[in-house]
């Protein structure tokens, strides 16, 4: 069996995260929003705010928890893309926040989710 590409793994992680968020009653507004070179994995609404979600998945914690892979550069890019998303939809000033969904997906096991709300500002 061929090894999954980085993009395939990313899509799988985002599918899992979307299902997780929808199970909490959230509405998914957009996936993989790009502005210039900046990307937001998931844009959702949780009945209080627009939530920009960064998703990270690992097969184990051997090399650290998925959350540890959210770099300062990634945070800057999420801010940039989120500002563009809000501006394009004339939603400047609306409540918004930034969450991280970390997923541990061990082989032949159910995924383990770690959701940090308001993870960065």
Where are these regions (language model features)?
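Short glycine/proline- and charge-enriched loop/turn segments
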Residues: 1-3, 58-61, 115-116
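Acidic-basic catalytic patches of nuclease active cores, encompassing PD-(D/E)XK
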Residues: 1-31
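Conserved catalytic cores of phosphodiester-cleaving nucleases, focusing on short active-site segments
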Residues: 21, 40-61, 78
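Hydrophobic "anchor" residues on beta-strands that sit immediately upstream
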Residues: 27, 50, 95
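Short acidic/glycine-enriched loop/turn segments that link adjacent beta-strands
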Residues: 35-38
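Mg2+/Mn2+-dependent nuclease catalytic core
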Residues: 59-79, 87-88
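Domain-level recognition of nuclease-like catalytic cores that cleave nucleotide substrates
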Residues: 88-121
